[in-house]
Regions:
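Solvent-exposed loop/turn and edge beta-strand elements of beta-rich ligand-binding domains
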Residues: 1-211
Length: 211
């Protein structure tokens, strides 16, 4: 229920607003998902309707009606990174990752960071569609740090249904260093293995060598 509605007399250009019986009124609002949001195909539903009266006073006794309920859903996703040895199977401890998302200006801003520890699986929850960058900020001892991985999360929803559903979910690498993601629409997960290799990185021409 919205209780703090304001009287509108002019639009955003300062022009007088005239409302007739044929006027179409659109109410827009924003909301932020919290840590209790459901991840995956179930989505987070929101139902809206308008109760109206032919009496202009909110406390009046005129007849009332209600518009048909309109249901929408907001979907959120998770990226799951499995850290593995160069055999591409053995879990590898000692890594830490930071996930960034590209904003409207094209700049990457930090979403969250997971520090190194005993875990070999890193789960980044509460993500939306968009462009991301994964950086290995801590590397297992004796292994080479991987290059940053940039990828794009894309999703399609059935927006016209009375029960909105998630139709597709993909993540595609957009950088030279590529990851292959496996998608699971049900739990909203995009999973990839990140491989670390042992040894020294060969120096570039003219640079100081490593041992």
């Amino acid at each position: 229920t919205i209780n703090d509605l304001k009287t509108v007399t002019t639009d955003h250009k300062g022009q007088a607003v005239t409302i007739t019986k044929d006027s179409k009124i659109v109410v827009r609002y924003t909301a932020k998902l919290n840590d209790q949001a459901v991840i995956g195909s179930t989505g987070n539903s929101n139902t809206a309707s308008l109760i109206y009266s032919n009496d202009p006073n909110s406390t009046g006794g005129g007849s009332k009606g209600e518009t048909p309920k309109d249901k929408v859903a907001v979907f959120t996703y998770q990226v799951v990174i499995n850290k593995v040895d160069q055999d591409k199977q053995t879990p590898l401890k000692g890594a830490g990752f930071t996930l960034y998302k590209k904003d409207a200006t094209g700049k990457y801003t930090k979403v969250t960071e997971i520090a190194a520890g005993e875990t070999t699986t890193f789960t980044f929850k509460g993500l939306s569609a968009g462009d991301y960058k994964l950086s290995e900020t801590q590397t297992p001892a004796g292994y080479n740090t991987i290059a940053d991985v940039e990828f794009k999360i894309s999703a399609e929803m059935d927006r016209t249904s009375d029960n909105p559903t998630l139709k597709s979910l993909t993540a595609t690498a957009t950088s030279t260093n590529k990851l292959t993601f496996t998608s699971n629409i049900t739990d909203g997960s995009l999973t990839a293995n990140v491989v670390n290799k042992k040894g020294s990185i060969l120096p570039s021409t003219g640079s100081i060598g490593t041992t």
